[in-house]
A protein has these predicted regions:
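Polytopic transmembrane helical bundles with strong interfacial aromatic enrichment
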Residues: 1-261
Length: 262
């Protein structure tokens, strides 16, 4: 197996998919940093083309800051923020969106070239194009998420939309890995179905579920509710776990239940 690995040379399609995976992973990390710095609502408009460039002069910065001052989050949490502080949070959100544009171009342009040059097998084109559509849809989902934090009296984005945005990001990453893995099967003997691969799939699904539950924790800021472990304020199952009606809402909207489930 080692000799096969040493002799193996990746083709251009595999390298392209590998770079795409790294960029998506970086995007997920940058998205987490954007959330932790409370920067996600700093850009109050969705401008896929016009938004490529950040504000280039002081007047433009002031204009963007004035837009931010109109949303509930500023009034509730950042009312003492100055222009310098706004530039910092703006940078995080702008960088997140910019990386999204880069991912789209890095995936789309080589895809077109590889299809024209027949580097991708005809029967696989649908799968590759499907991932491109997912990437495009993710941009729309991102704005759909952000817009929920600009409406009414909300000071945070919807936890449902946050979980959707994060969930789709990991689906894109998984699809890229699947395309990369199947582009040229390296070691057929270890790719056969066995009990280990079944357990790996189950574990992968559980990890994905945990990630989604974590998104609900982040969206509701439920992680701040209980600071004891393994008991939650002295109870294994926190009091009020099923306090919402209908009961299914507890899974997604009850802070105690959301933290316990995670």
């Amino acid at each position: 197996m080692k000799s096969k690995f040493l002799k193996y040379k990746a083709d251009k399609v595999e390298l392209w998919l590998y770079v795409s995976m790294l960029l998506v992973a970086a995007m997920i990390i940058l998205g987490g940093a954007t959330r932790l710095t409370n920067s996600g609502l700093s850009i109050t408009e969705w401008a896929p083309i016009k938004g490529i460039l950040p504000p280039l002069n002081n007047q433009s910065w002031v204009s963007e800051f004035e837009k931010y001052k109109l949303i509930p989050e500023f009034l509730a949490e950042h009312s003492d923020m100055d222009l310098s502080g706004f530039k910092t949070i703006y940078f995080w959100e702008w960088s997140h969106r910019q990386l999204g544009r880069i991912i789209g171009l890095v995936y789309a342009i080589p895809l077109i070239i590889f299809i024209i040059s027949k580097k991708i097998q005809k029967e696989k084109i649908f799968n590759f194009v499907g991932v491109l559509l997912l990437i495009c849809m993710q941009g729309i989902i991102g704005w759909w998420m952000v817009s929920s934090g600009l409406e009414n009296d909300r000071i945070d984005v919807s936890q449902y939309r946050l979980a959707t945005h994060l969930g789709v990001a990991f689906i894109i990453l998984a699809c890229l890995f699947w395309l990369w893995k199947n582009q040229k099967e390296r070691w057929p003997e270890i790719s056969k179905k066995n009990s280990l691969t079944r357990y790996t799939k189950i574990l992968t699904l559980l990890v994905y579920l945990q990630i989604i539950l974590g998104a609900f924790v982040a969206g509701l800021k439920a992680g701040r509710t209980y600071n004891t472990w393994p008991l939650m304020d002295g109870d294994f199952v926190p009091r009020g776990y099923m306090r919402l009606d209908p009961y299914w809402k507890n899974i997604f909207e009850n802070i105690s239940a959301v933290q316990f489930n995670h």
